[in-house]
């Protein structure tokens, strides 16, 4: 029994020795993948995660936390864009320093355009712009001088409105016959004196008597048909008052009905027209004797 028990103990010891490395490896893997923050002395190890500096593309962040190099993305070895011999303020040196790193800003479709800052280039562009402006002003001045002649005034537009209610333009100096013809033509084009001369113009009342309808046989009080000079061409409406007539007419007497039937009695004798309200548009003025 002793040899058998010794063999069993030896087998168990060998089994323990074989399983110990595998358990240690599993423990190390679990500890490395732990989400806990590592200690100050323990190095940081991240498994299957993106770099800690996040985006390292076009905007060129460093993928290592403590990297102090210039970040030459052209690779190791001699730099083909070595501008060490150039001056520090030259555009070549600036361009070389820029090519050694990713751009600091987005330079895509809507991005900024890199232009080397050069005072000489700015001076050249400004001088070219001033020269172009000077040539343009000189050419404009020469064109004005060469194109001026005696008929330049006649080509200008009239100084004022020359329509129906407008002013007659001043006649230019020239032939007397031509001036007379032009004045006659302009006079014929003007509106009549006693007619409507515009949208806001007034109409003369001196010629309104013949435009009224003749006196008919109705003899009513509606006041739309009047004699030529009756009521001074004023509107006589239904709402107008009718004053009493005194009996010194021509054989008519004081009959009020006769005054209504014969409205022309106002013109006979020494009778004046009534001063009362005779319509919707105001009073009727007294007729001159």
From Swiss-Prot:
Region (Disordered): 24-94
Tissue-wise expression: Strong expression is seen in a group of 14 cells plus one isolated cell in the midgut of stage 17 embryos. Also expressed in a pair of medially located unidentified cells, just posterior to the brain, and in two lateral groups of cells that may be associated with tracheae. Expression in the larval gut is restricted to cells with endocrine cell-like morphology in the posterior midgut, just anterior to the malphigian tubules. In the brain, expression is detected in a restricted number of neuronal cell bodies.
Location within or outside the cell: Secreted
This protein's encoding gene: Tk
Similarity comment: family membership: Belongs to the tachykinin family.
Modified residues (Asparagine amide): 95
Superkingdom, taxonomy of origin: Eukaryota
Keywords: Amidation, Behavior, Cleavage on pair of basic residues, Neuropeptide, Secreted, Signal
Protein name: Tachykinins
GO CC term (a single one): extracellular space
Key word Cytoplasm present: no
Entry's Gene Ontology BP terms: adult walking behavior; inter-male aggressive behavior; lipid metabolic process; neuropeptide signaling pathway; positive regulation of hindgut contraction; positive regulation of sensory perception of pain; response to pheromone; sensory perception of smell
Residue ranges of the propeptide: 25-47, 285-289
Biased composition (Basic and acidic residues): 60-69
Entry function: Tachykinins are active peptides which excite neurons, evoke behavioral responses, are potent vasodilators and secretagogues, and contract (directly or indirectly) many smooth muscles. Stimulates gut muscle contractions. Required for the response to the male sex pheromone CH503 which is transferred from males to females during mating and inhibits courtship behavior by other males.
Modified residues (Valine amide): 153
Leader sequence residues: 1-24
GO molecular function, one term: tachykinin receptor binding
Residues that bear Arginine amide: 59, 110, 165, 200, 239, 281
Species the sequence originates in: Drosophila melanogaster
Keyword Signal listed: yes
């Amino acid at each position: 029994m002793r040899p058998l028990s010794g063999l069993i103990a030896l087998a168990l010891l060998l089994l323990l020795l074989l399983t110990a490395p595998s358990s240690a490896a599993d423990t190390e893997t679990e500890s490395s993948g732990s989400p806990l923050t590592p200690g100050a002395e323990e190095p940081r190890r991240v498994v299957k995660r993106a770099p800690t500096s996040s985006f390292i593309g076009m905007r060129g962040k460093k993928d290592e936390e403590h990297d102090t190099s210039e970040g030459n993305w052209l690779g190791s070895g001699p730099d083909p864009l070595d501008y060490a011999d150039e001056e520090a303020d030259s555009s070549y040196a600036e361009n070389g320093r820029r090519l050694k790193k990713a751009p600091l800003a987005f330079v895509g479709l809507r991005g900024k355009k890199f232009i080397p800052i050069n005072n000489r280039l700015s001076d050249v562009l400004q001088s070219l712009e001033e020269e172009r402006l000077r040539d343009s002003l000189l050419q404009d001045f020469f064109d004005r001088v060469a194109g001026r002649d005696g008929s330049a005034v006649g080509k200008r537009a009239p100084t004022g409105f020359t329509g129906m209610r407008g002013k007659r333009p001043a006649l230019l100096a020239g032939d007397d016959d031509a001036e007379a013809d032009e004045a006659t033509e302009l006079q014929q084009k003007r509106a009549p004196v006693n007619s409507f001369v515009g949208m806001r113009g007034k109409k003369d009342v001196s010629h309104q008597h013949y435009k009224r309808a003749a006196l008919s046989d109705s003899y009513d009080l509606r006041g739309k048909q009047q004699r030529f000079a009756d009521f001074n061409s004023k509107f006589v409406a239904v709402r107008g008052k009718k004053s009493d007539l005194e009996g010194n007419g021509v054989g008519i007497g004081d009959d009020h009905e006769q005054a209504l039937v014969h409205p022309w009695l106002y013109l006979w004798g020494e009778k004046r027209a009534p001063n009362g309200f005779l319509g919707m548009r105001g009073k009727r003025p007294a007729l001159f004797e």
